[in-house]
A protein has these predicted regions:
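PRPP-associated nucleotide enzymes
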Residues: 1-196
Length: 196
Protein backbone atom coordinates (compact mmCIF):
# COMPACT_ATOMS: atom_id res chain seq x y z
CA UNK A 1 0.00 0.00 0.00
CA UNK A 2 2.82 2.44 0.82
CA UNK A 3 4.61 1.68 -2.46
CA UNK A 4 1.39 2.29 -4.39
CA UNK A 5 0.78 5.51 -2.49
CA UNK A 6 4.23 6.79 -3.45
CA UNK A 7 3.74 5.68 -7.06
CA UNK A 8 0.43 7.55 -7.26
CA UNK A 9 2.11 10.73 -6.05
CA UNK A 10 4.92 10.28 -8.58
CA UNK A 11 2.38 10.16 -11.41
CA UNK A 12 1.33 13.71 -10.42
CA UNK A 13 4.99 14.80 -10.62
CA UNK A 14 5.75 13.61 -14.16
CA UNK A 15 7.45 16.90 -15.11
CA UNK A 16 9.29 17.46 -11.81
CA UNK A 17 13.08 17.26 -12.21
CA UNK A 18 14.80 15.76 -9.18
CA UNK A 19 18.06 13.99 -8.39
CA UNK A 20 16.48 11.32 -6.18
CA UNK A 21 13.64 10.42 -3.82
CA UNK A 22 14.00 9.88 -0.07
CA UNK A 23 11.76 8.89 2.80
CA UNK A 24 11.66 10.55 6.19
CA UNK A 25 12.62 7.56 8.40
CA UNK A 26 10.83 5.37 9.08
CA UNK A 27 7.28 6.26 8.09
CA UNK A 28 8.11 7.72 4.66
CA UNK A 29 10.49 5.02 3.42
CA UNK A 30 7.94 2.75 1.71
CA UNK A 31 6.23 5.69 0.02
CA UNK A 32 9.58 7.01 -1.25
CA UNK A 33 10.58 3.63 -2.71
CA UNK A 34 7.28 3.47 -4.59
CA UNK A 35 7.77 7.07 -5.77
CA UNK A 36 11.33 6.37 -6.97
CA UNK A 37 10.31 3.18 -8.78
CA UNK A 38 7.41 4.90 -10.57
CA UNK A 39 9.49 7.93 -11.54
CA UNK A 40 12.57 5.82 -12.36
CA UNK A 41 14.92 7.88 -10.20
CA UNK A 42 17.32 6.70 -7.49
CA UNK A 43 16.13 6.15 -3.94
CA UNK A 44 18.62 7.34 -1.30
CA UNK A 45 18.71 7.68 2.48
CA UNK A 46 20.09 11.15 3.31
CA UNK A 47 19.07 10.92 6.98
CA UNK A 48 20.75 8.92 9.73
CA UNK A 49 18.20 7.99 12.36
CA UNK A 50 19.24 8.29 16.00
CA UNK A 51 16.89 5.84 17.69
CA UNK A 52 17.37 6.27 21.47
CA UNK A 53 14.64 8.94 21.58
CA UNK A 54 10.87 8.90 21.73
CA UNK A 55 9.38 6.66 19.05
CA UNK A 56 7.37 9.60 17.63
CA UNK A 57 8.47 13.22 18.04
CA UNK A 58 4.91 14.52 18.36
CA UNK A 59 4.17 12.35 21.43
CA UNK A 60 5.72 14.40 24.27
CA UNK A 61 3.20 16.89 25.67
CA UNK A 62 5.71 19.62 26.38
CA UNK A 63 6.67 21.69 23.28
CA UNK A 64 10.24 22.13 24.51
CA UNK A 65 10.63 18.35 24.80
CA UNK A 66 9.04 17.80 21.34
CA UNK A 67 11.54 20.27 19.86
CA UNK A 68 14.47 18.50 21.54
CA UNK A 69 13.35 15.04 20.39
CA UNK A 70 12.78 16.28 16.83
CA UNK A 71 16.22 17.91 16.77
CA UNK A 72 18.02 14.78 17.95
CA UNK A 73 16.09 12.16 16.01
CA UNK A 74 17.25 12.59 12.39
CA UNK A 75 20.63 13.80 11.19
CA UNK A 76 21.15 14.73 7.50
CA UNK A 77 24.17 13.57 5.50
CA UNK A 78 25.51 16.64 3.66
CA UNK A 79 27.31 14.46 1.09
CA UNK A 80 23.90 13.27 -0.11
CA UNK A 81 22.10 16.62 0.07
CA UNK A 82 24.47 19.42 -0.97
CA UNK A 83 23.29 20.95 -4.26
CA UNK A 84 20.64 18.26 -4.77
CA UNK A 85 16.96 18.47 -5.76
CA UNK A 86 15.12 15.91 -3.65
CA UNK A 87 11.58 14.66 -3.16
CA UNK A 88 11.07 13.72 0.48
CA UNK A 89 8.10 11.59 1.46
CA UNK A 90 6.46 11.10 4.83
CA UNK A 91 3.18 9.64 6.00
CA UNK A 92 1.65 12.84 7.40
CA UNK A 93 2.13 16.13 9.20
CA UNK A 94 0.65 15.98 12.69
CA UNK A 95 2.03 18.93 14.68
CA UNK A 96 4.75 19.91 12.20
CA UNK A 97 7.48 19.89 14.86
CA UNK A 98 9.75 17.25 13.36
CA UNK A 99 9.21 18.25 9.74
CA UNK A 100 10.04 21.92 10.36
CA UNK A 101 13.24 21.00 12.22
CA UNK A 102 14.32 18.56 9.49
CA UNK A 103 13.77 21.15 6.77
CA UNK A 104 15.95 23.68 8.62
CA UNK A 105 18.68 21.04 8.93
CA UNK A 106 18.43 20.23 5.22
CA UNK A 107 18.72 23.90 4.25
CA UNK A 108 21.82 24.12 6.47
CA UNK A 109 23.46 21.35 4.37
CA UNK A 110 23.12 23.35 1.16
CA UNK A 111 20.32 21.38 -0.45
CA UNK A 112 19.10 22.98 -3.68
CA UNK A 113 15.40 22.01 -3.61
CA UNK A 114 13.11 20.29 -1.11
CA UNK A 115 9.93 18.88 -2.60
CA UNK A 116 7.78 17.45 0.22
CA UNK A 117 5.12 14.83 -0.49
CA UNK A 118 2.77 13.65 2.25
CA UNK A 119 1.03 10.29 1.90
CA UNK A 120 -2.27 11.43 3.39
CA UNK A 121 -4.40 14.54 3.02
CA UNK A 122 -3.87 17.35 5.57
CA UNK A 123 -4.98 16.30 9.06
CA UNK A 124 -7.78 18.78 9.70
CA UNK A 125 -9.97 16.70 12.01
CA UNK A 126 -8.62 14.86 15.08
CA UNK A 127 -9.34 11.20 15.79
CA UNK A 128 -10.08 10.44 19.42
CA UNK A 129 -9.28 6.76 18.83
CA UNK A 130 -5.63 7.43 17.96
CA UNK A 131 -3.75 7.74 21.22
CA UNK A 132 -0.86 9.90 20.00
CA UNK A 133 -1.02 12.16 23.03
CA UNK A 134 -3.10 13.07 26.04
CA UNK A 135 -3.84 16.51 24.61
CA UNK A 136 -7.32 16.94 23.17
CA UNK A 137 -6.79 20.32 21.52
CA UNK A 138 -7.67 20.31 17.83
CA UNK A 139 -5.04 23.03 17.42
CA UNK A 140 -2.29 20.49 18.01
CA UNK A 141 -2.87 19.65 14.34
CA UNK A 142 -0.69 21.76 12.05
CA UNK A 143 -3.36 22.10 9.34
CA UNK A 144 -5.96 23.14 11.92
CA UNK A 145 -3.66 25.92 13.21
CA UNK A 146 -3.12 27.20 9.66
CA UNK A 147 -6.90 27.26 9.07
CA UNK A 148 -7.44 29.08 12.37
CA UNK A 149 -4.92 31.74 11.33
CA UNK A 150 -6.45 32.04 7.86
CA UNK A 151 -9.96 32.43 9.24
CA UNK A 152 -8.87 34.74 12.07
CA UNK A 153 -11.09 33.02 14.66
CA UNK A 154 -10.29 30.97 17.74
CA UNK A 155 -13.32 28.69 17.54
CA UNK A 156 -13.39 26.85 14.22
CA UNK A 157 -16.52 24.94 13.31
CA UNK A 158 -16.48 21.70 11.35
CA UNK A 159 -18.46 23.50 8.66
CA UNK A 160 -15.68 26.08 8.26
CA UNK A 161 -12.99 23.38 8.19
CA UNK A 162 -14.85 21.43 5.50
CA UNK A 163 -14.10 24.32 3.10
CA UNK A 164 -10.44 23.22 3.22
CA UNK A 165 -10.93 19.52 2.48
CA UNK A 166 -11.34 19.57 -1.33
CA UNK A 167 -7.82 19.45 -2.87
CA UNK A 168 -9.12 21.29 -5.95
CA UNK A 169 -10.72 24.07 -3.88
CA UNK A 170 -9.16 27.52 -3.52
CA UNK A 171 -9.16 27.39 0.31
CA UNK A 172 -7.25 24.10 0.26
CA UNK A 173 -4.70 25.42 -2.24
CA UNK A 174 -4.21 28.59 -0.20
CA UNK A 175 -3.72 26.54 2.99
CA UNK A 176 -1.10 24.32 1.33
CA UNK A 177 0.75 27.35 -0.06
CA UNK A 178 0.88 28.93 3.41
CA UNK A 179 2.28 25.67 4.79
CA UNK A 180 4.85 25.51 1.99
CA UNK A 181 6.09 29.02 2.70
CA UNK A 182 6.07 28.52 6.46
CA UNK A 183 8.10 25.32 6.46
CA UNK A 184 9.87 26.54 3.91
CA UNK A 185 9.75 24.14 0.97
CA UNK A 186 10.28 24.34 -2.77
CA UNK A 187 6.98 22.52 -3.25
CA UNK A 188 4.42 20.72 -1.07
CA UNK A 189 1.77 18.22 -2.10
CA UNK A 190 -0.55 15.94 -0.17
CA UNK A 191 -1.93 12.60 -1.29
CA UNK A 192 -5.44 12.86 -2.71
CA UNK A 193 -8.30 10.66 -1.57
CA UNK A 194 -9.24 10.01 -5.19
CA UNK A 195 -5.82 8.36 -5.69
CA UNK A 196 -6.31 5.85 -2.88
Amino acid sequence: ARYESGAAMARHDADLEIDYAAGIPDSGVGHAIGYANQKVVPYKRPFVKYTPTWPRSFMPQNQKMRDLVAKMKLLPNEKLTYGKRVVFMDDSIVRGTQLKDNIVKLHDTGIKAIHMRLACPPLIFPCRFLNFSTSRSTYDLYARRIIRDMEGVDNLTDETCMKYVNPDGEKHKEMVEIMRKHLPLTSLKFHRLDDL
